[in-house]
């Protein structure tokens, strides 16, 4: 397996994702979106797609830095705001996050990171309610499969155009869309603390894990066949465990089924019956 095996027809993909945003937002009865613009590639791609699908007047970018956030990240977010000519607001999370952090030891970075992600989502959904817009998500397929995200934090959204794209494919789409290379080529980071990077947290690169996930999920290859492709047993076992262990993050809260028509189980598609008016 080679990285190019994950390549897609990115022109067709762009059309599909623009139609997805237009149709889903219309079905919900809305016309605009708000998203957190971090300065990273995922949020840049979602912002670009939203503008092409809805128009710049229907897209609001929220910058939500913490006091230790990378200055480079803010500059890259501003670069996309200027490129797309979209409205933007800066809402620092420092005061709210620091209130929580008083009770969280500095060494407990996972807890602090989850608090930061959920604080940002509180701001996004408050702006969504204020403006009557929908929150557009930016989590990609790799993150969702590995559980590399915060429930009701960065994983929360109303619509997510990237959820079925591996990180490698997001990069390919970004190049097709003309996203500045400085955003595409930099080390991915959730900007949760100074010097944080996704790949150092995970212990492997997106390129490596995307190929493994593709063989596991899309090709449905057995363990021995994947090991025959040169994947180490320890890497395979670790990634499989992450995918299985984090299944709960990919589901809405599990409901105890009592009746014959249970929300999310038997009764799922009400909003598709007709347009909301």
Curated annotation (Swiss-Prot):
Q: Where does ATP bind?
A: 36-43, 138, 167, 189
Gene3D superfamilies under this entry?
A: HUPs
- Family label: Belongs to the NAD synthetase family.
Pfam families in UniProt: NAD_synthase
- Record-level Gene Ontology MF annotations: ATP binding; glutaminase activity; metal ion binding; NAD+ synthase (glutamine-hydrolyzing) activity; NAD+ synthase activity
Q: Name one GO cellular component term.
A: cytoplasm
Reactions it catalyzes: deamido-NAD(+) + NH4(+) + ATP = AMP + diphosphate + NAD(+) + H(+)
What processes in GO biological process is this protein linked to?
Answer: NAD biosynthetic process
Tell me the CDD domains matching this sequence: NAD_synthase
Functionally, this protein is described as follows: Catalyzes the ATP-dependent amidation of deamido-NAD to form NAD. Uses ammonia as a nitrogen source.
Q: What is its EC number?
A: 6.3.1.5
Which InterPro entries does the protein's record reference?
NAD/GMP_synthase, NAD_synthase, NH(3)-dep_NAD(+)_synth, Rossmann-like_a/b/a_fold
Pathway as given in its UniProt record? Cofactor biosynthesis; NAD(+) biosynthesis; NAD(+) from deamido-NAD(+) (ammonia route): step 1/1
Which superkingdom does the taxonomy of this entry point to? Answer: Bacteria
Assembly and partners are described as:
Homodimer.
Which residues make up the binding site for deamido-NAD(+)? Answer: 118
Keyword DNA-binding assigned? no
Protein name, entry field: NH(3)-dependent NAD(+) synthetase
Residues binding Mg(2+): 42, 143
Keywords, sorted A to Z: ATP-binding, Ligase, Magnesium, Metal-binding, NAD, Nucleotide-binding
């Amino acid at each position: 397996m080679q990285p190019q095996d994950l390549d897609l027809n990115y022109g067709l993909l762009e059309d599909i994702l623009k139609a997805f945003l237009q149709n889903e937002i219309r079905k919900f009865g809305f016309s605009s979106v708000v998203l957190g613009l971090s300065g990273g590639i995922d949020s840049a791609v979602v912002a670009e797609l939203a503008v092409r699908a809805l128009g710049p007047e229907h897209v609001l970018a929220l910058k939500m830095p913490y006091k230790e956030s990378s200055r480079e990240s803010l500059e890259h977010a501003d670069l996309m705001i200027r490129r797309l000519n979209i409205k933007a607001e800066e809402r620092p999370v420092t005061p709210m996050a620091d209130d929580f952090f008083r009770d969280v030891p500095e060494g407990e970075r996972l807890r602090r990171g989850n608090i930061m992600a959920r604080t940002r989502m509180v701001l996004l959904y408050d702006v969504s309610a204020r403006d009557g817009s929908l929150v557009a998500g930016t989590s990609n397929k790799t993150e969702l499969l590995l559980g590399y995200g915060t429930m009701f934090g960065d994983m929360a959204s109303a619509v997510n155009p990237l959820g079925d794209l591996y990180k490698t494919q997001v990069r390919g789409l970004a190049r097709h869309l003309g996203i500045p290379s400085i955003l595409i080529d930099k080390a991915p980071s959730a900007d949760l603390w100074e010097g944080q990077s996704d790949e150092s947290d995970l212990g492997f690169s997106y390129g490596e894990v995307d190929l493994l996930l593709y063989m596991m999920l899309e090709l449905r290859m057995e363990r021995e066949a994947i090991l025959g492709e040169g994947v180490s047993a320890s890497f395979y076992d670790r990634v499989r465990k992450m995918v299985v262990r984090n299944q709960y993050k990919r589901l809405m809260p599990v409901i105890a089924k009592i009746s014959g028509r249970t929300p999310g189980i038997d009764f799922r598609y009400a909003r598709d019956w007709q347009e909301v008016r």
